[in-house]
């Protein structure tokens, strides 16, 4: 019998490009920026396998920079799965989503990148 393949429970950091335009296509104007934050949380939860997702203040500011009606079409984010140090925490890991640097040539063709941490 084969072993059950589960998500590896380790600390890891990855960079993703999220296409928010596709996720917010049929959304009302006055709900676009809040829905963008919810979609980023949902994406990080799916990719990292953690229920506890924390969004950085800078990422929140960038989403809301053009108001409630104009979130960016695509955004480059860095998602880090970290160990939860709280004793009364429900889960062992949490995800921290921050904004990543955008290269001068744009977002096309970047793909997913694993970041090596210097600890």
Swiss-Prot record:
Q: Name one GO molecular function term.
A: structural constituent of ribosome
Q: Per the UniProt entry, what is one GO biological process?
A: translation
Show the InterPro entries listed in the entry.
Ribosomal_eL31, Ribosomal_eL31_CS, Ribosomal_eL31_dom_sf
Q: Known SUPFAM superfamilies for this protein?
A: Ribosomal protein L31e
Q: Which GO terms describe its cellular component?
A: cytosolic large ribosomal subunit
Superkingdom of source: Eukaryota
KW Ribosomal protein (keyword) present: yes
A Pfam family the protein falls into: Ribosomal_L31e
**Keyword set for this entry?**
Ribonucleoprotein, Ribosomal protein
The entry's family comment says: Belongs to the eukaryotic ribosomal protein eL31 family.
Protein name (Swiss-Prot/TrEMBL): Large ribosomal subunit protein eL31y
**What are the top taxonomic ranks of the organism?**
Eukaryota, Viridiplantae, Streptophyta, Embryophyta, Tracheophyta
Q: Which gene encodes it?
A: RPL31B
């Amino acid at each position: 019998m084969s072993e059950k393949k589960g998500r590896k429970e380790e600390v890891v950091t990855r960079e993703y490009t999220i296409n928010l335009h596709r996720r917010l296509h049929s959304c009302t104007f006055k709900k676009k920026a809040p829905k963008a934050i919810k979609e980023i949380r949902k994406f990080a939860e799916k990719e990292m396998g953690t229920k506890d997702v924390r969004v950085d203040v800078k990422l929140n500011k960038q989403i809301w920079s053009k108001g409630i009606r104009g979130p960016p079409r695509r955004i480059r984010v860095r998602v880090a799965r970290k160990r939860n140090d709280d004793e009364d925490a429900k889960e062992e890991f949490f995800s921290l989503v921050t904004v990543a640097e955008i290269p001068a040539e744009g977002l096309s063709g970047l793909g997913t990148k694993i970041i090596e941490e210097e600890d």
